[in-house]
Amino acid sequence: MSMPLHQISAIPSQDAISARVYRSKTKDKEQNEKTLGHSMSHPSNISKAGSSPPSTTAPVSAFSRTSVTPSNQDICRICHCEGDDESPLITPCHCTGSLHFVHQACLQQWIKSSDTRCCELCKYEFIMETKLKPLRKWEKLQMTASERRKIMCSVTFHVIAITCVVWSLYVLIDRTAEEIKQGQVTGILEWPFWTKLVVVAIGFTGGLLFMYVQCKVYLQLWKRLKAYNRVIYVQNCPETSKKNIFEKSALTEPTLENKEGHGMCHSTTNSSCTEPEDTGAEIINV
């Protein structure tokens, strides 16, 4: 009995191919719509977050961070800059806190301009080593134009005044000497002689006082110029330097203890890890 044979075609029909293409296209469209929806929802959330009023907790936390965490970096109390290898910070006096450190160059400039040898706050006298520059390297004092003009006028007036006083004294002394000679001849000294003698004495005393005062002023200017043209090296205060060393050692001790603790933990963990390996090796040998 013969079975009816049906011819089965292995090639898919055109309708099946078009259906598959349509399904793949619809799937691609759905995936694209989903991805677009996610991308649109993400910026909308961002815009909502940006448009929403700022919470009060964020500024408080930021303020607490900035206010609670102190700055561990030391700064100079004159220029408010940090120290480095070229210009390190020193501790020349007993001041503490933000006034504890200062640059060597800043302190030298301040000492030259103020002409003082002690701290203006704690009144501690600086430990200094000074030496003068050579004369050819001396610098002028930092003065304004009005101060220089006053000094020049003062010097000119003093020179003229001293010349007049000396000339007047010379004339009076000469006339007095002539009258003394005449008195020796006649044996009588008239009243103009005593008047001139009193004037000479008063002029001479006034001239000495005037010279003393002016020499004192010029001596102060000379000291200022001398102090300005000296090389100063300020040393650390012994008490503050010892205190800084003690604080640094106290800070480094906990770190060393932590390192030792970590080392012990590592050693214990390694020993605990090696014990099972040894037992396993013994079991294998058995």
From Swiss-Prot:
List the RING-CH-type ZnF regions, as residue ranges: 68-129
- What reaction gets catalysed by this protein? S-ubiquitinyl-[E2 ubiquitin-conjugating enzyme]-L-cysteine + [acceptor protein]-L-lysine = [E2 ubiquitin-conjugating enzyme]-L-cysteine + N(6)-ubiquitinyl-[acceptor protein]-L-lysine
Q: What is the annotated signal peptide range for this record?
A: none
Biased composition, class Low complexity, residue ranges? 47-64
Keywords recorded for this protein, A-Z: Adaptive immunity, Cytoplasmic vesicle, Endoplasmic reticulum, Endosome, Golgi apparatus, Immunity, Lysosome, Membrane, Metal-binding, Phosphoprotein, Transferase, Transmembrane, Transmembrane helix, Ubl conjugation pathway, Zinc, Zinc-finger
Q: Where in the cell is it found?
A: Golgi apparatus membrane; Endoplasmic reticulum membrane; Cytoplasmic vesicle membrane; Lysosome membrane
- Bias kind Basic and acidic residues: ranges: 25-36
Q: Which residues carry this modification: Phosphoserine?
A: S249
What Gene Ontology terms for biological process does this UniProt record contain? Answer: adaptive immune response; antigen processing and presentation of peptide antigen via MHC class II; negative regulation of MHC class II biosynthetic process; protein ubiquitination
On whether Transmembrane helix is a keyword of this UniProt record, the answer is yes
Q: Where is this region: Disordered?
A: 23-65, 260-279
Write down what this protein is called. Answer: E3 ubiquitin-protein ligase MARCHF8
